[in-house]
Amino acid sequence: MAPKKHSAFMVFVTEWRNHNVEGRRMTLPQAVSHCGTIWEKMTAQQRGPYQSGAKDADVADRAKRERLNCHGQGIAQVDQVQKEAAESLMHMKRSTERLVINAKKSHDLENAKFVFATFNYFTKALTTDVYVPAEFAACEYSLKEGIRSIYSSMIDPGQIIFGQGSDALHHSSTTHDLPLPPNALGEKNMAKLYRNIIDYLTKCQGGDKPLIVFTPAENIAMVKSCFRYLECEDDSKDGGRTIQVFDIEYLLFILKKEVMDVADLNDEKINKFVTDAFFKKDFFEFTAGIACQYHEDNDRTKYCTQSMVTRWAYTFSDFMCGDLAITVQPGKHIPAHTKPNYRIISSDASSLAHESSFDSFYSLPGSRVKKENQSEDVLLSSSRPSVESSSYTPTDHTAFTADLSKLCEFPSLGMRNSSKHRGLDVSAQRERNAGAWNLPTHSRSIQKFSDNDFSVTGADGKHKN
């Protein structure tokens, strides 16, 4: 059913009641009756504004109202946000793939440079995505050279969001343990810090290339917000250059696939879930000497941004340098100091004390040498003393001592031995069981007693009575 159209006359009645004291005292039927005589005397020119107002009201009614979801948000607005997020994700993936594939086409994949970056923050606004930064670190990395350079700085924002001091204190005490403003450490000039970061990224990636940093997916929103926090204090805007933040886990997946393709290795078992699981294991989490001095002194190296970007670089090297036969360098691809945690056992038992090998946990090709001609007996003799050389004499404690080669002795379910074999074998069985201590009761020798061996005191008296 089509909606009713507005009447120009009713528009006139409504306006007359609103502008006249007498009209406000009347009911609607009375006002319609009174305005009818006035409407008849009006010219077409006088009625024109009311007719236009009626048409405008019709148009407004025909306009659809925006539908809302259960949270009171406009559905069209929510769809637009989701569409922009999907486009941003697709742009990130395509840009990452383009970086890796271009390096592969130029036969320079091992020298491709990537920048890993992350922030620590004091607190986050309750209703917006504003983060107050506390610490920043970035690392320039390539497969061949490992860690090329590291930029790290603590940040003193001067103040935190009003009313969130308790949240900031709780977050700091449970993570990075940095002192809160006004006692915060580090750079106080946000504009200067942002320009220093821009200069470092430009030096790493070149002035004509977009500034791209990689960080874990769960930190992307936080890192973008912290960059905006620093950028808003910079009036120069540095020529309008912005920093793009991409997913480091997707970079690991794409880079691993291309590295295995270059090395002519089978990559059927490599997928996004495998690479994500490898990255999240964080094998180098407790490596000493890679965090800043403050976090080293306070035993919070796990949450230090400098330690984070360094561990990510070590993870990339551990996962892919072996595929390209790249020799790892301590301090660049792996920690500078490692602890031996295994040894290679030689086939010669006498050389055990002389041939212990340095070991690390890293997946380097040829790190474990296995000799095919090494027999199992030699390995057993080299790892434990032999039986012949020991003074221990084994003793048979077998509970079942019957001869299973005889049909009559073979145990059966719900069946007794035949009577013709029982009498012949009982004496032989008892002789075999004479020295056994752990036999069941029915297998032990039974001493025969006569009736005279059993007597009950007072029994004779009772019979006499």
UniProtKB/Swiss-Prot annotation:
Q: Where is the composition biased (Basic and acidic residues)?
A: 422-433
Concerning Pfam families, the annotation shows: Maelstrom (PF13017)
List localization entries. Answer: Cytoplasm; Nucleus
Residue ranges flagged as DNA-binding region? 2-69
Task: Give this protein's Gene Ontology molecular function annotations.
Answer: transcription cis-regulatory region binding
Q: Where is this region: Disordered?
A: 373-394, 419-443
Please give the GO cellular component terms listed in this UniProt entry: cytoplasm; nucleus; P granule; perinuclear region of cytoplasm
Q: Does the keyword Lipid biosynthesis apply?
A: no
Q: Which InterPro entries does this entry report, sorted A to Z?
A: HMG_box_dom_sf (IPR036910), Maelstrom (IPR024970), Protein_maelstrom (IPR039259)
Q: Does the keyword Transcription regulation apply?
A: yes
Positions in coiled-coil regions: none
Tell me, which GO biological process terms does this entry list? germ-line stem cell population maintenance; male meiotic nuclear division; negative regulation of DNA-templated transcription; oogenesis; piRNA processing; regulation of miRNA-mediated gene silencing; regulatory ncRNA-mediated gene silencing; spermatogenesis
Q: Gene3D superfamilies under this entry?
A: High mobility group box domain
Compositional bias ranges of the Low complexity kind:
381-391
Main localization of the protein?
Answer: cytoplasm
**Which keywords label this protein?**
Cytoplasm, Developmental protein, Differentiation, DNA-binding, Meiosis, Nucleus, Oogenesis, Repressor, RNA-mediated gene silencing, Transcription, Transcription regulation
What the protein does?
Involved both in the piRNA and miRNA metabolic processes. As a component of the meiotic nuage, plays a central role during oogenesis by repressing transposable elements and preventing their mobilization, which is essential for the germline integrity. Repression of transposable elements is mediated via the piRNA metabolic process, which mediates the repression of transposable elements during meiosis by forming complexes composed of piRNAs and Piwi proteins and governs the repression of transposons.
As for family, the record states:
Belongs to the maelstrom family.
Can you name this protein?
A: Protein maelstrom
- Give the species this sequence originates from: Drosophila erecta
